[in-house]
Amino acid sequence: MIGLNTAAIYILQTLGSLYLLIVLLRFILQLVRADFYNPLSQFIVRATKPLLNPLRRIIPGFGGIDLASLVLAILIQLVLMILILMLMGYGVGGFIMQLLIWSIIAVTSLFLKVFFFALIISVILSWVAPGSYNPGAQLVNQICEPLLMPFRKLLPNLGGLDLSPIFAFLALKLIDMLVINNLAAMTGMPQQLSIFL
């Protein structure tokens, strides 16, 4: 029985986190004004449409921000946490507000991770395939550009040497360590849910 629960938790976490990532990417792509005609963007739009369209009737966008996809990401994270805790044998009845707070923290952590790994991919592509125009590379660059732009404005021109990714990495890591981890600790997030950070 324990083995079955462990397997169920693994499958639920893997599939749930994958769909959560797709939903959060939908939010990020609209946030950074990415090309929605990109084949990967179109896949993300189609994958999220069944759940997002009904939610959009209740939650409209605001200032160019796709609030419906952000709310959907938080709700998916909340359901994932509830189901995983229940499979572990914990009651969740009196902890819904805490679980909601932990869900927001976890989604924020994933948000930072998307930019972190997009930066890694962007740096690698700039070394091995500079000027590549495949859909994946184009989308990664569009995600990274708004993050790198403020650092490029602050840093001096070093004759083609772009140090902005290094400072962006440091900023993301500091936010993760000083804000996300501390918020999780301050709100008493249990060890069982740290898999989402």
Swiss-Prot record:
Q: Where is the signal peptide, in residue numbers?
A: none
Q: Major place of localization?
A: membrane
* Protein localization: Cell membrane
GO cellular component annotations, sorted alphabetically?
A: plasma membrane
Database matches in InterPro entries: CCB3/YggT (IPR003425)
Give the transmembrane ranges. Answer: 9-29, 67-87, 104-124, 160-180
In what way does this protein cross or attach to the membrane?
Answer: Multi-pass membrane protein
Q: Which of UniProt's keywords are assigned here?
A: Cell membrane, Membrane, Transmembrane, Transmembrane helix
> What family, per the record?
Belongs to the YggT family.
Which protein are we looking at?
A: Uncharacterized protein PA0392
